[in-house]
């Protein structure tokens, strides 16, 4: 199925995209020059996008600054299976560009303070697990193995998916998207 320049393998993908397009706010809307940082790997990464609050000091690392209130929400959303799928349909499959981050929709105002606390807990749990399973190279760079923390990524999707109006079937589709590649050793 083809919509514009986007090609979908499954009909469910069009429904997910339509729900994302209903969201009128994007990450760009919460950029703040003096905000809190979110770090991301600009190149490589294959089947996972590693998004953290702490820099790795890699030459392939990018940074964006967002309003303090939304740092964990942005980090969690960009770590989600939903963002991975969104990135695949909008990218060259190799690089993570700031324009792809900026255009990702997040329904910021639909999250209550309690829900922001919950997403902060989910994201911190994921990051703690991610770091506990990471390795440091001889040159001092962190190597992450996100597939070992996938259950925490899935928990993020289950929580934020409802805010996009995604059905349980759509959330399961995203959680299992590219599963055979994303979980291979």
Across the structure, where does each feature detected by a protein language model lie?
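S-adenosyl-L-methionine
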Residues: 22-185
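Flexible, glycine-/basic-rich loop-and-beta segments that form/coincide
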Residues: 1-21
């Amino acid at each position: 199925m083809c919509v514009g320049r986007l090609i979908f393998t499954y009909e469910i993908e069009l429904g997910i995209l339509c729900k994302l397009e209903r969201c009128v706010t994007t990450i760009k809307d919460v950029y703040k020059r003096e905000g809190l940082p979110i770090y991301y790997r600009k190149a490589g990464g294959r089947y996972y996008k590693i998004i953290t609050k702490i820099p790795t000091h890699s030459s392939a690392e990018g940074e964006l600054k967002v309003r303090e209130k939304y740092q964990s929400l942005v980090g969690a959303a960009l770590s989600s299976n939903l963002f991975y799928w969104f990135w695949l349909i909008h990218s060259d499959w190799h690089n993570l560009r700031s324009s792809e981050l900026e255009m990702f929709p997040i329904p910021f105002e639909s999250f209550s303070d309690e829900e922001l606390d919950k997403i902060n807990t989910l994201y911190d749990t994921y990051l703690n697990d991610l770091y506990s399973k990471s390795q440091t190279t001889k040159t001092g760079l962190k190597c992450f193995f996100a597939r070992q923390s996938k259950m925490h990524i899935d928990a993020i999707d289950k929580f934020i998916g409802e805010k996009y109006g995604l059905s349980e079937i759509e959330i399961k589709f995203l959680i299992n998207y590219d599963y055979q590649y994303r979980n291979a050793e």
